[in-house]
Swiss-Prot record:
GO molecular function: rRNA binding
Protein name: Nucleolar protein 12
Annotated gene: NOP12
Extent of Basic and acidic residues compositional bias: 87-104
Main location: nucleus
Matches recorded under Gene3D superfamilies: 3.30.70.330
S-S pairs: none
Species for this entry: Candida glabrata (strain ATCC 2001 / BCRC 20586 / JCM 3761 / NBRC 0622 / NRRL Y-65 / CBS 138) (Yeast)
UniProt entry tagged with the keyword Oxidoreductase: no
C-alpha cells in the first residue's frame, strides 16, 4: 500500500512541464524513490522494559565513573620523582630574598643620588643645554677637568604638561606648560664618593640657565635651620622661585628658596621658606613684611607678602629599641627605607637594622625601658616603714 500517493502525482506533473520547456534538455530528471514508513505502536510492557534498560545503563555509568579525588590520587601515584614540581615554600623564600635584594639595592642607590631643584625646563627641550648640565655635574672642580664623577642616569620630575595626555607621550611631544618654567632632577652616580658633598656645596645656589639651582643630598639633606630662615605667605599659586631670590637678595646671601607645591598638579600652595647663610639677614628680611613683591611672571599682579619667623618645633631624634641614638649610616638606611618599604617591613626594620663596618655589642639587644611596675627604692621611706612593721609583727 502506497502511503504518499499525492507526492507521486505532483512529481509526474512537474516532469511533464519540464519536458515541454526549452530551457532544459530533453532528458527528464529521475524521480526520487519514497521509502515506506512503518508506524509501530509500543505497548505498556515494552515501555516498562525500555525504562528498566535505561535505568540499568545509568546505574552502570554511575558505577564506572570514578570520583575526582580518586583520579588525583592515581595521578600522584603514577608521577615519577622527575615530574614532581618543586616545593612552593622554597619558591616563596626565593621571591622574598629577591625582593629584599632589590630594596637593599634601592637604599644603596640613594646614597649616590643627589637632588637638583629649580632647574630650567630648557634642559628637557634643548640638547645643548642638557649637555652643559651634564658637564656641570660631571666635574668636581672647575679648575681641574680631569677630576670627574661618572653619571649613571638623570631623571626629571615635577614636569608640568599643557595637555591631558599620558606623561610619556606629552614628554616626547614637548607639550610643557608655559606658566611652569622649572623642573626637578635626580642625578645617580655610578660610584659612591666622599667628593659628592664637596660638589653639592659648590653647586648649591649657582646660576644655571638664568635660574638659581638648589642642590642637596637625598640621604643626608641639609638641615632646615629655623633661626636662619623666614616663612613667606600670601604667594600666588603660579609664583616662581626666582621672584623670591630677587626680592630677598638685598637682605643677604641666600642658601635656598623652597616653594611648597602640590605633588600632583605641581602648583604652589601659597607659601614658601627662604633660608639665609647668615643669622643677621633674617632681621632685614622681616622688614619686608606687608610690602609688595614684583613677580617675574608679567601676567601676575603685585601681592603684599606676609614675612614671619619660622616656628622652632623640636623633633625627637630617632633611636633604636635598645635606647641608643642612631649613627648617620643607620639614619640613612632608616630614612630611605620609610619610602621604599611597606608598613610591615618598616616595623621589622629596627630589629634587623644593620650597617656594614659597625661592630655589634652585648647591650644592643637589651631594652632600656622595662615593662611592669617600677622597682621600689631600698633606702626609701616606704621600705623603711614596711621593714619596721614586719619586725613589730614578728615580736608579737
Amino acid at each position: 500500500m502506497n502511503l504518499f500517493p499525492e507526492t507521486v502525482a505532483t512529481d509526474d506533473k512537474v516532469s511533464q512541464l519540464f519536458k515541454t520547456s526549452n530551457a532544459l534538455d530533453k532528458k527528464a530528471t529521475p524521480l526520487i524513490k519514497v521509502q515506506k514508513i512503518e508506524v509501530i505502536k509500543k505497548t505498556d510492557k515494552d515501555a516498562d522494559g525500555d525504562e528498566k534498560m535505561e535505568d540499568a545503563a545509568s546505574d552502570d555509568a554511575k558505577v564506572k565513573k570514578p570520583s575526582k579525588k580518586k583520579l588525583a590520587k592515581k595521578n600522584k601515584e603514577t608521577k615519577t620523582p622527575e615530574q614532581v614540581p618543586e616545593e612552593p615554600e622554597k619558591l616563596v623564600e626565593e621571591g622574598k630574598e629577591s625582593k629584599k635584594s632589590t630594596k637593599e639595592d634601592e637604599i644603596e642607590k640613594a646614597s649616590r643620588t643627589i637632588f637638583v631643584g629649580n632647574l630650567s625646563n630648557e634642559v628637557i627641550i634643548s640638547k645643548s643645554t642638557y649637555k652643559l648640565f651634564q658637564k656641570l655635574f660631571n666635574n668636581i672642580d672647575d679648575d681641574d677637568e680631569n677630576k670627574k664623577l661618572p653619571i649613571q642616569s638623570i631623571r626629571f620630575r615635577s614636569v608640568s604638561f599643557e595637555d591631558a595626555l599620558p606623561r610619556k607621550v606629552a614628554f616626547v611631544q614637548q607639550k610643557l606648560h608655559k606658566s611652569r618654567a622649572s623642573v626637578n632632577a635626580y642625578i645617580v652616580y655610578k660610584e659612591q664618593s666622599p667628593l659628592l658633598n664637596k660638589l653639592i656645596k659648590r653647586l648649591n645656589g649657582q646660576v644655571f640657565s638664568n635660574r638659581h639651582l638648589r642642590v642637596d643630598s637625598i640621604t643626608h639633606p641639609a638641615p632646615h635651620d629655623k633661626q636662619r630662615s623666614v616663612f613667606v605667605g600670601n604667594l600666588d599659586f603660579e609664583e616662581d622661585e626666582e621672584s623670591l631670590w630677587k626680592h630677598f637678595g638685598a637682605c643677604g646671601s641666600i642658601e635656598y628658596v623652597r616653594i611648597v607645591r602640590d605633588p600632583k598638579t605641581n602648583m604652589g600652595k601659597g607659601f614658601a621658606y627662604v633660608q639665609f647663610n647668615e643669622l643677621q639677614s633674617v632681621s632685614k628680611a622681616l622688614l619686608l613684611n606687608e610690602k609688595p613683591m614684583i613677580s617675574q611672571n608679567e601676567h601676575l599682579k603685585k601681592r603684599k607678602l606676609r614675612v614671619t619667623r619660622c616656628k622652632n618645633i623640636r623633633k625627637v631624634e630617632p633611636t633604636l629599641k635598645s635606647g641608643k641614638y642612631m649613627t648617620d649610616g643607620q639614619k640613612t638606611k632608616l630614612g630611605r627605607a620609610k619610602k621604599i618599604l611597606n608598613k610591615a617591613e618598616r616595623s621589622k626594620l629596627l630589629k634587623e637594622l644593620t650597617v656594614e663596618g659597625i661592630r655589634a655589642t652585648k647591650d644592643d639587644s637589651k631594652p632600656v625601658l622595662k615593662k611592669g611596675k617600677k622597682e621600689r627604692s631600698k633606702t626609701g621611706r616606704v621600705t623603711k616603714r614596711s621593714q619596721a612593721f614586719k619586725k613589730s609583727q614578728q615580736k608579737k
